[in-house]
Amino acid sequence: MDVNFEYYKIFYYVAKYHNFTKAAQALNNSQPNITRAMNWIDFAVVSTPAEVDSPLKQIMLMPFQEILVGGTTFTALGSQELSLREVKNYPLISLGRETMTYKFYNSVFLSHGLDLSPDTEAATADQILPLVKCELGLAFLPQPMAAPSLLKKEIVQIPLKDEIPERQICLVYDSQHPMGAAARELKNTIVSGRG
């Protein structure tokens, strides 16, 4: 079984179906809520950076690279190579300030002496791609998430001069909380299919 971004969606829909709405909402809104969500779930599949304090443990599953993309009105930028300073000249879409992804990009921009100041903040990662397709700005997306739209030429990849650090998909669980048989089996299946 391949580990990919669909696990997050699977967890979310299973949680919603089984009425685990508090856990699904806590994870969907903001990764810093992992600790709170662990009160209601056996494990979570999230992206780094993840704030994981004892007794929580994390297992790295799969690396991923994020790329800069824009709608088709930004096609000309696809043949250029932009610095992060130049990216700031265009409207930018990101996740909200309370998310770990925002904090990650804020630190990337700060390391280049820049402030991250997005024009549009999305509540969830799956809202970003439609906003890009609606020409609301540029955004950083995981390459696997952007790939289908890139192939269909619905969006364009914009090369960067500055390197964006690789991130990881990881599984977070409470090492002091016993899991049921089904959760343990699913966790083992996910972990055995990593990388």
Give the label of every model feature segment:
Residues 14-28:
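Short helix-boundary/capping micro-motifs
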Residues 53-92:
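Flexible hinge/capping segments at coil-to-helix
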Residues 57-67, 152-165:
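Short beta-strand->loop
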Residues 77, 91-112, 179-183, 187:
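Secondary-structure junction motif
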Residues 156-195:
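A late-sequence structural motif
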